[in-house]
Structures are given as C-alpha cells and as structure tokens.
Regions:
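Compositionally biased, charge-rich terminal segments
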Residues: 170-181
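Nucleotide-sugar donor-binding/catalytic module of glycosyltransferases
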Residues: 1-172
Length: 181
C-alpha cells in the first residue's frame, strides 16, 4: 500500500492481531488472502475508505446469523462526502432480495455483504481475473446459481466515502466496465 496504511496500522499495532502487507494481484486477490487468513465464522469486507456508522453494526449482523439459518446478510449503504462524513451524497437502499430484481441488474452493496466462511470454503473465492466486477460475480454465484439463503437488514450498515476506486468518477466506472469485458 502507498497510502500511509502501514504507518497507521503500526500506530495501532496493540489493537491488531494479524497483519499481511505484501504484493498482491489486485483488490480481489487481497480480499481472498484476507478470507483465507480469517479465523472467524462470518466474514465482512470493509474497503479502505468505508466505515461502520456505529459500534452496533457487527452485533446486529451477528445476531441475525445467530437467530437464523442464513448464509449471507446485507443492508443499506450511504455514500458520504469525503471531507464531511455526516453529509450524505447518496442513499443506496437495497430492499429485500428477490431473483427477478437480480436478473434485472439489481445489486446489493458489496461492503454490506456478510457471508459465512463456510460458504467461501464450499463455493470458492473472488475471481481475480475480473478487475472490478468480481464482487458482482460473487453475488450472482452465491444468490443466483447456488440460491443461498440471504437476509436483508433494513438499516445503514456501511458508510462509503466518495472518491474510492469504483466511485471516484463516471469515467472510472466506464474504464472498469471496459477492463471487465
């Protein structure tokens, strides 16, 4: 990483149990490494500029997994101003999952997607040959192909700062689409 991440993590080292800092083949390769190294039963992936809106999010997600036989959980996401994270730029209200919505291009917000580790072990990791659509392919694989049981939590689970790899600009989106085709 070239964005001061290692310096920040070094500053917080007393709160970190495990750290991998090495070359990888893109964001999805890094995510796969994290999944393989994880020791918990539930995996959520939070990107560099994303954060949970409060300290209760993980407890709420854990409760849904504990109280049900679901394989996956997701919720809503808000895009926030990079300089003022209280200022909401866009609210991504996911709504309840159904196959027809997915068939028509609906996508749940990937940073809000929590999955049992056993699901990754059974159905595989992210496709590293896709540059920006591996998260979408994973959603399609798990929910459409394998029809896993997913539960929607109708709350904001993640805040995403504007300016990241996929939402920096319209041209970034076009470039990403071209890379994945």
């Amino acid at each position: 990483s070239t964005d001061w991440t290692i310096d920040i993590l070094d500053y917080c080292k007393d709160k970190i149990d495990y750290l991998i800092s090495e070359e990888d083949n893109g964001i999805y390769d890094a995510m796969n490494k994290g999944i393989l190294a994880s020791t918990g039963d539930i995996i959520g992936i939070l990107n560099a500029d994303d954060f949970y809106p409060d300290n209760e999010v993980l407890s709420k997600v854990a409760k849904v997994f504990k109280d049900s036989d679901c394989d996956c959980v997701y919720g809503d996401l808000v895009y926030v101003n990079k300089g003022d994270t209280k200022k909401i730029v866009r609210y991504w209200k996911s709504g309840k999952f159904n196959i027809s919505k997915l068939n028509n291009g609906w996508m749940l917000p990937h940073p809000t997607f929590f999955v049992r580790k056993s699901v990754y072990e059974k159905y595989g990791l992210y496709s590293t040959d896709l540059k920006s659509a591996a998260d979408y392919e994973m959603i399609l694989r798990l929910l459409l192909k394998y029809k896993l049981n997913v539960i929607y939590i109708p709350e904001i689970l993640v805040k995403m700062r504007m300016g990241g790899k996929s939402n920096r600009s319209f041209w970034n989106r076009i470039k990403a689409n071209h890379e994945d085709s």
